[in-house]
Amino acid sequence: LHPRVRRQRQMCIRDRVDLASIGFVDRIGYRASMILAHAMAAAGLILLTVLPECLGNPFVGLLIAVMIYAIGGGLLEVLVSPVVEACPTDNKEKAMSLLHSFYCWGHVGVVLLSTLFFRIFGIANWKYMALVWALIPIANGIFFTRVPIAPLLDEGEKGLTMGELFKKKIFWVLMLMMLCAGASEQAVSQWASTLAEKSFGINKTIGDLAGPMAFAILMGSSRAFYGKFGDKINLERFMQYSAVLCMVSYLMIAFIPVPALGILGCAVCGLSVGIMWPGTFSMAAASVKRGGTALFALLALAGDVGCSSGPTYVGMISGALNDNLKLGIFAALIFPVLMIMGIKMIGSLQKYD
């Protein structure tokens, strides 16, 4: 499977998991759900090394394994943010941003260590690498049998139902912001290596590392920066400035013909989109009281839809313009523009409430 196709299929599964989680997470509890999520993630990675050879059709085996760890990943996406939001921290926005920075460090670590492993031991030994990565969710699942987990809602308090959330105007603005956060991020991230190779004429191996790696490192740095200094920074203003910087990065990618500056544009995009996803989660938690699991699950769903639709939109526009990927990225300016509009609308709705 092409990595982009595999990613899209994982997103489809995660969308369904996001919706399904609303019905059972509160029923079985966050601890059981977290352990289940890690077990599914580990099982999928382990089965990746076994099923393709056990089944008559290797592709079917690969697909089943991917589906299993995608379910685990989708559950984790829904669960981890509310668990951290419930922690008794002084500044929840800082904690949320720091949490999401580890998504980026995980991305960087997997790419670097896997590349190093394959360079030393050869790609034929990829199964051992998959088993090594499976140790992380196994260990984390064991930890979650012991760590204290604070309740998201006060005792006796009930979270809002989906119907109650749907009646709130502010909820729909937050959903739009999450969609734009995912789309702004993945519109460049998923096309970064192709941009480096086809549009900037950079060697494929270097392009695969330079584009996505620079993007992930700066995205993680942005989140870690807010995680450290967030108590001194206005979140809404920081998100608006970041959306403007995102627009600048798209223009750099689309119109500057110098390859080095094009790669720099990809990196700047990572820096700019870093705060969008965790920032929207934090704004939602502060704006929608008693949102509970349903709020976080639906926001995760909107983010995943953005992660799928953003690069798809870029690809469609590029295809209509003679495969001009730069103009496809330029067309994605609509996402940070809508993000800015959403942030301003949230401020107005909060004053109205």
Which residues make up each language-model segment?
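Helix-loop-helix hairpin linking two adjacent transmembrane segments in secondary transporters
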Residues: D90-N91, L98-I149
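Single conserved hydrophobic/aromatic residue that forms the stacking wall/gate
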Residues: L1-I13
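Interfacial helix-cap and linker-helix signal at transmembrane-aqueous boundaries
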Residues: F24-V25, L116-G122, A196-E197, F229-G230, ...
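Intracellular juxtamembrane helix-capping segments at the cytosolic ends
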Residues: L75-P88, I275-V288
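Extracytoplasmic gate region of multi-pass secondary transporters
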Residues: K168-S221
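C-terminal ends and interior cores of transmembrane alpha-helices
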Residues: A39-G56, L245-P257
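Central cavity-lining transmembrane alpha-helices of secondary-active solute carriers
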Residues: Q10, R14-G23, M213-F225
